[in-house]
Amino acid sequence: MIWHVQNENFILDSTRIFMKAFHLLLFNGSFIFPECILIFGLILLLMIDSTSDQKDRPWFYFISSTSLVISITALLFRWREEPIISFSGNFQTNNFNEIFQFLILLCSTLCIPLSVEYIECTEMAITEFLLFILTATLGGMFLCGANDLITIFVAPECFSLCSYLLSGYTKRDLRSNEATMKYLLMGGASSSILVHGFSWLYGSSGGEIELQEIVNGLINTQMYNSPGISIALISITVGLGFKLSPAPFHQWTPDVYEGSPTPVVAFLSVTSKVAASASATRILDIPFYFSSNEWHLLLEILAILSMILGNLLAITQTSMKRMLAYSSIGQIGYVIIGIIVGDSNDGYASMITYMLFYISMNLGTFACIVLFGLRTGTDNIRDYAGLYTKDPFLALSLALCLLSLGGLPPLAGFFGKLYLFWCGWQAGLYFLVSIGLLTSVLSIYYYLKIIKLLMTGRNQEITPYVRNYRRSPLRSNNSIELSMTVCVIASTLPGISMNPILAIAQDTLF
């Protein structure tokens, strides 16, 4: 009898929860319409996979890419609408959040073509791979719009869990298994530290979880200068640091870059930084409004360490992916300058502009690495020697992307860094900008070292990998070259294209 009553109560409670969730989705679903498109794409992938055979694999790519493109279109149609807070305060829609969501969708759209030939050559499971990519994209989009502590924690966990699975997708590779284990342990530790910081923020504000309400709660409780807020700030900075991977929270990055499948590294190298930057900007700028001097100092230290250590350690690397891992650590130092500058001197606009260029530069470089790796089976920098003699298009594409990453004029990377450093200089960050300029010059050295190898024609320097280099006969080869071409063009855009990009970026500030 007691069991029967308990069972009825459980059914009633479950029904109430389901109805409440349905009610929220019914009346707030339009505010997450781009995310709903991705969810529909995920469901469609599962349905087709369960009812079809392996001959329908092109449909999987088509559905994934189409859902991403439609989601981007829906996001653009919603552009310049008034800011809206939905789902009982859990989610906020505004231009600032939407441009970061657009960047994440753009990354995913470009990464799927990079994966086609790699998946076919390595015989990986296609459906699960695309499901993880779309789910991680969904988690990143929700993180950009998250407006309360619970959503800010759950959304990156959705992204992180898919990232762990993707990094260990080649199960027979020992390096991949090692990278996944390190990534999982470091990610779990960082999430624990992040939640610890959230708990201090929650308690100090009198039990508030929405970002703006936390500020009001801190004013009411007079706890905005308390030691608890300092503990929360340090814990949250450390937790977010593992997501952004600046120095000294970068230990996992080189191993994960080297051990994970190259298309996965391309995806993680940009989407994780875009989503974490959006989240860090909102968390630090809103709840820690009264501690701006403290978190500015913390970020300045992280930026200096990242720019110096990242670029110095990149010089000594022999693996192309490890070199790009340390390069990305230096690049996040430049992005942090924009976060520190903030809204007052176009800091956010410069950060967004540089991130847009960084996406094209980085993905273009990884597209070249994927193509070279599939045709030669090597990742060693020395094995790129003489590539220009065998494949001029691939060698020139890689050279242009690397030069743009280094910030050489008149490439896009130069103008992105110029605007970012100029905003930092106007904000009085003279020392930080000086370090950024010096480390940018340093980065040019190891990029030019690779380009010199690409263009060499001396037989004694050319390895057997390039001597036996053959173009892949696979038809899907065109999809990688398409993504590569798009990224190379975007990386080499002259400065005349900066004005419309800056105007859009400046219009996204919240």
From Swiss-Prot:
Similarity annotation: Belongs to the complex I subunit 2 family.
Annotated HAMAP family: NDH1_NuoN_1 (MF_00445)
Functional description taken from the UniProt entry: NDH shuttles electrons from NAD(P)H:plastoquinone, via FMN and iron-sulfur (Fe-S) centers, to quinones in the photosynthetic chain and possibly in a chloroplast respiratory chain. The immediate electron acceptor for the enzyme in this species is believed to be plastoquinone. Couples the redox reaction to proton translocation, and thus conserves the redox energy in a proton gradient.
Phylogenetic lineage: Eukaryota, Viridiplantae, Streptophyta, Embryophyta, Tracheophyta
Record protein name field: NAD(P)H-quinone oxidoreductase subunit 2 A, chloroplastic
Top-level EC class as recorded in UniProt: translocase
Chain segments annotated as transmembrane: 24-44, 59-79, 99-119, 124-144, 149-169, 183-203, 229-249, 295-315, 323-343, 354-374, 395-415, 418-438
NCBIfam families per the UniProt record, alphabetical: NDH_I_N, PRK02504.1
